[in-house]
Structures are given as structure tokens and as C-alpha cells.
Amino acid sequence: MARGGDTGCTGPSETSASGAVAIAFPGLEGPPADAQYQTLALTVPKSWSPSPRSLPPALSCPPPQPAMLEHLSSLPTQMDYKGQKLAEQMFQGIILFSAIVGFIYGYVAEQFGWTVYIVMAGFAFSCLLTLPPWPIYRRHPLKWLPVQESSTDDKKPGERKIKRHAKNN
């Protein structure tokens, strides 16, 4: 929670040390001396934590619209087993290649810093290639078994046979 008891609504709100809250209404702008700038001072106890539900209807803000989240939730996030293996091999290969190139360049230039920079760049590049679920990692989708009815529900508890393991002496 931000200083001043910010409720996540648009518009500035500040809390003084005494607990008084000054809330500026979003439609009204201007300096405090301006007649159109209106603030509402509320005295609240320090233990009170403001939430959008506890504010009066005039002060509460509407719920945020998840437009960006709807777009992100439509992206595929799964990766098949062969894709995971390919991503792991690519990750290790790029890291190894950048380490070798970085070591050789750092040795020739006699600058250890360049070795570190090249390895870090290889790590960033490998993360960019392997962490997102690119379509190359989803070429072999899993074939799930169909849902089967449970056969243990038909039998009564007394009809089940108890399997015992033989003792190994």
C-alpha cells in the first residue's frame, strides 16, 4: 500500500500525520487556491485501513477493466515434453557457446569484464529463446486418455479383496 492510504483510485490523495485524508476529485483540477479545486477532509483512526468497499459510493473507484489480462490469457502457455528437452538443450548450448567465446575474447583482449559481459549476453539470449512457449516447443501435443468411470464405486467395501505382500525372510 502506498503512503497516504492510497486505495488504487485515480486522483491524488494524501494523509497527514493526524490521520486526516485529503482526496481530490478526478474531474476538478487546479491549484488549491482555485475555487474549482475541492478537497474533502476526513478524520480516520490510524488503525483503519481504507478499502474500495469501505469508502462511500461517491469516493470509491470503479473496478479496473482487465483488458490487457484478457489478451494475455489467450496466449498458450503449455510446452510438450519434446519441446522441453529441445529448450533445455538450446539453453545449455547457447550458454556453453557464449562461455567459450567470452573466455577466448577475454583472454585475447586481457579483459575479464568482456568475458562476463559476453556470458551475460548469451544468458539473456538463451532466456529469450527458451523461456517463452514458442510454437517450436509445441509440435508434439500430449494425447490425454479419455475419462473413465470409476469401477471401485460399484463394489461394496466388504467385497474388495485385500492384497497382502509376501514376507521376504
Curated annotation (Swiss-Prot):
Residue spans crossing the bilayer: 94-114, 116-136
Subcellular location: Endoplasmic reticulum membrane
Topology class, membrane: Multi-pass membrane protein
UniProt keyword terms in alphabetical order: Endoplasmic reticulum, Membrane, Transmembrane, Transmembrane helix
Keyword flag Transmembrane: yes
Residues on Cytoplasmic side: 1-93, 137-169
GO BP term, example: signal peptide processing
Entry's Gene Ontology cellular component terms: signal peptidase complex
Pfam entry (one): SPC12
Family annotation (InterPro entries): Spc1/SPCS1 (IPR009542)
Parts of the chain on the Lumenal side: 115
Post-translational modification: May be phosphorylated.
Disordered as annotated region, ranges: 148-169
Family: Belongs to the SPCS1 family.
Physiological role: Component of the signal peptidase complex (SPC) which catalyzes the cleavage of N-terminal signal sequences from nascent proteins as they are translocated into the lumen of the endoplasmic reticulum. Dispensable for SPC enzymatic activity.
Binding partners and assembly: Component of the signal peptidase complex paralog A (SPC-A) composed of a catalytic subunit SEC11A and three accessory subunits SPCS1, SPCS2 and SPCS3. Component of the signal peptidase complex paralog C (SPC-C) composed of a catalytic subunit SEC11C and three accessory subunits SPCS1, SPCS2 and SPCS3. Within the complex, interacts with SPCS2 and SPCS3. The complex induces a local thinning of the ER membrane which is used to measure the length of the signal peptide (SP) h-region of protein substrates. This ensures the selectivity of the complex towards h-regions shorter than 18-20 amino acids.
Full protein name: Signal peptidase complex subunit 1
